[in-house]
């Protein structure tokens, strides 16, 4: 409903979805019939943008463009930031539903701070 109203009234709203691959303790791929949640924005005539949520600069650029659209009176934007949930769903979550070694490898390989330090701003 909020996206529908924002689109109909061309509100300066930026919707951000932190796509972390999990719905509580269930992998996203088993609970949704679309690969990219941002595809759903098109149903409301809202531009959907997919960005690497681990890349600080990519997120900044997507947000900058969405802010420019909003300020120009062009209505809302939906940003899907693809990332990975490193911690459990709640404090004390034993995380029995996923492979801890795989999670640590993903974090090690895609740590946003390491990527930020390795890539100078353009």
Per-range role (PLM):
Residues 1-122:
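Glycine-rich ThDP/TPP pyrophosphate-binding loop and its adjacent helix/strand module
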């Amino acid at each position: 409903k909020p996206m529908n109203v924002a689109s109909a009234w061309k509100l300066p709203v930026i919707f951000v979805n932190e796509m972390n691959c999990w719905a509580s303790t269930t992998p996203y791929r088993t609970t949704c019939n679309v690969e990219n949640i941002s595809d759903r924005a098109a149903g409301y005539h809202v531009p959907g943008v997919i960005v690497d949520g681990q890349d600080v600069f990519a997120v900044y650029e997507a947000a900058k463009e969405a802010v420019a659209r909003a300020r120009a009176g062009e209505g809302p934007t939906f940003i899907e930031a693809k990332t990975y949930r490193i911690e459990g769903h709640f404090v004390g979550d034993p995380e029995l539903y996923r492979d801890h070694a795989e999670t640590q490898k993903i974090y090690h390989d895609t740590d946003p701070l390491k990527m930020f330090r390795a890539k100078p701003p353009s």
